[in-house]
Amino acid sequence: MNPTKRNSHAIVEFVDVLLRDGAVIQADAIVTVAGVPLLGISLRAAIAGMTTMTEYGIFDGWDADHRRRNAQP
Amino acid sequence: MTPAQSQARAQLSDGRYVYCVVDTTSVPSASVGETTGIDDETVRVVSVDGVGAVVHDCTSVYDADDIDQVKRWLVTHQQVVDDVSDVFGTPLPMRFDTVFAGGDSALTDWLADTHPRLRTELDGFAGCWEYRVTLLWDPQPFEAHVTATDDTLQALEARQAEADAGTTFLLEKQYDARLAERRRARRSALASDLSAAVEPVATQVASQDTTTSLRDESVSERHTPIARLAVLAPETDESALGSQLDDIAARDGVTIRFTGPWPPYTFAPDICTDEPNQA
C-alpha cells in the first residue's frame, strides 16, 4: 500500500500532530507567556470534526497541489 | 484569549513566525519559490552558514476563537512546510505558532548559537520522513472464529444448555471472561506483529496513544484503533514499508491506515539554547 496525505483521516492526523509535536524551541526570544506555549490544550480540544474542513474548501488548493505532485514520475 | 496573551500580542512588533529549519548548504536561501504563508504573508529563509529558518514577518502570535480560522492557519502552515521540503529536503519542523521576537537579528543570533545542534539534527533526518500507521480492528470475524473453535468456550456453552438459571448466569460470566481474554490476546498479538513488521525498515519507531485529541468521524463504530505508530524511515524504503503493512492489512478484521510522508514532527527534538552543543 502507499501512504496518503489527502484522506480525511490523514487530515485529522496531521492537525493533531502539528498541534502536539514538532520541535519546541526554548530561547529567550521565543514568544511565550510565563514559559507556556500560547496555543494550548484548550484549543486542541475545541477543534473537532476535522472532516468538515473539506466542506469549507480549505483543502481544495492543497488537494490539487498534491494530486499534481503524485502524478509526477 | 487570556489577558496575558493579549498583552503578548500587543507587545510583539517585529516577530518572525518560524515554520521549520532547513539545510541551505546546496540550495540558495532565495529558492523558497512562490509559496505564501499564513494570512498570505511572504515566506523567506533567514540563513546562517547553511542552516536556514523558514519564516514570515509577523506582529502577533496566532490564536483565535474562530476555529475555522485556526484550521486554515494549520493547513497553510503544513502547505509551506511541504513546499519548502520540495526545495530543501527534509526539514526540522517547528511546532505550530513558534514565534520569535526581535526581528532577523534575534533569529540569526539563535541560529548561530544553536548551529551545531541544528546541523546535527538536519543531517540526521536527511532523506527520512515520518510515516504514521494506525491499526484498526473489527473483532467480529475473530470472535466468530473463536466461538466456533475454542474448546473452553464450546465446553462452557454445552454446560449452559443443561444448567439451572443460577449456574447458567455464572457460566455466562465465565464465557464472557474467556472470550475477552482471547480478544485481548489477539489485540496484543496484532500490535506486536505490526511493530515487528515496520521495525526492519524503520530508522526510529514511536508508539503512540491510540486516541487522538481530535474527533475522527471516518472511524467506524466497529473498528477499534489498537495500535498507532510514528515511523521514521528513509524515503527510499517507503514502498518496502507499504509492502510490510500489506501483510498485516490482509488479516481478518484489520484495516491499516498509512499516512505520510510527513516532516519528522514526532521525532523533532526540543531545542534549548543553553544546552551543550552535541556536534
From Swiss-Prot, chain A:
Induction context: In PHH4 (a deletion of the p-vac locus) transcribed in all growth phases, maximal expression in mid-stationary phase. An unstable 6kb transcript able to cover gvpD-gvpE-gvpF-gvpG-gvpH-gvpI-gvpJ-gvpK-gvpL-gvpM is detected, as well as smaller transcripts. Gas vesicles appear earlier when grown in static culture, possibly due to O(2)-limitation.
One Pfam family per UniProt: Gas_vesicle
PROSITE patterns, per the entry: GAS_VESICLE_A_1, GAS_VESICLE_A_2
Signal peptide boundaries: none
UniProt keyword annotation of Transmembrane helix present: no
Domain of life: Archaea
InterPro entries, per database record: Gas-vesicle_GvpA-like (IPR000638), GvpA (IPR050530), GvpA-like_CS (IPR018493)
GO CC list: gas vesicle; vesicle membrane
Chief subcellular location: other
Compartments (UniProt record): Gas vesicle
NCBIfam families xrefs: halo_gas_GvpM (NF046091)
Miscellaneous comment in the UniProt entry for this protein: Encoded in a 14-gene locus called c-vac which produces cylindrical gas vesicles only in the stationary growth phase.
Functional summary from the UniProt entry: Proteins GvpF to GvpM might be involved in nucleating gas vesicle formation. A minor component of the gas vesicle. Gas vesicles are hollow, gas filled proteinaceous nanostructures found in several microbial planktonic microorganisms. They allow positioning of halobacteria at the optimal depth for growth in the poorly aerated, shallow brine pools of their habitat. Expression of 2 c-vac DNA fragments containing 2 divergently transcribed regions (gvpE-gvpF-gvpG-gvpH-gvpI-gvpJ-gvpK-gvpL-gvpM and gvpA-gvpC-gvpN-gvpO) allows H.volcanii to produce gas vesicles.
Subunit record text: GvpF to GvpM interact with each other in vitro, and may form multi-subunit complex(es). Might interact with GvpA.
Family: Belongs to the gas vesicle GvpA family.
Annotated protein name in UniProt: Gas vesicle protein M2
Species assigned in the record: Halobacterium salinarum (strain ATCC 700922 / JCM 11081 / NRC-1) (Halobacterium halobium)
Phylogenetic placement of the source organism: Archaea, Methanobacteriati, Methanobacteriota, Stenosarchaea group, Halobacteria
Curated annotation (Swiss-Prot), chain B:
Induction: In PHH4 (a deletion of the p-vac locus) transcribed in all growth phases, maximal expression in mid-stationary phase. An unstable 6kb transcript able to cover gvpD-gvpE-gvpF-gvpG-gvpH-gvpI-gvpJ-gvpK-gvpL-gvpM is detected, as well as smaller transcripts. Gas vesicles appear earlier when grown in static culture, possibly due to O(2)-limitation.
GO cellular component: gas vesicle
Record-linked Pfam families: GvpL_GvpF
Keyword Oxidoreductase: no
Keywords: Gas vesicle, Plasmid
InterPro entries listed in its UniProt record: Gas_vesic_GvpL (IPR054796), GvpL/GvpF (IPR009430)
Keyword check for Acetylation: no
Biological processes, Gene Ontology terms: gas vesicle organization
Subcellular compartments: Gas vesicle
Family: Belongs to the gas vesicle GvpF/GvpL family.
Miscellaneous comment as given in the Swiss-Prot or TrEMBL entry: Encoded in a 14-gene locus called c-vac which produces cylindrical gas vesicles only in the stationary growth phase.
Function: Proteins GvpF to GvpM might be involved in nucleating gas vesicle formation. A minor component of the gas vesicle. Gas vesicles are hollow, gas filled proteinaceous nanostructures found in several microbial planktonic microorganisms. They allow positioning of halobacteria at the optimal depth for growth in the poorly aerated, shallow brine pools of their habitat. Expression of 2 c-vac DNA fragments containing 2 divergently transcribed regions (gvpE-gvpF-gvpG-gvpH-gvpI-gvpJ-gvpK-gvpL-gvpM and gvpA-gvpC-gvpN-gvpO) allows H.volcanii to produce gas vesicles.
The protein's assembly and partners: GvpF to GvpM interact with each other in vitro, and may form multi-subunit complex(es). Interacts with GvpC, GvpN and GvpO.
Protein name: Gas vesicle protein L2
Recorded name of the encoding gene: gvpL2
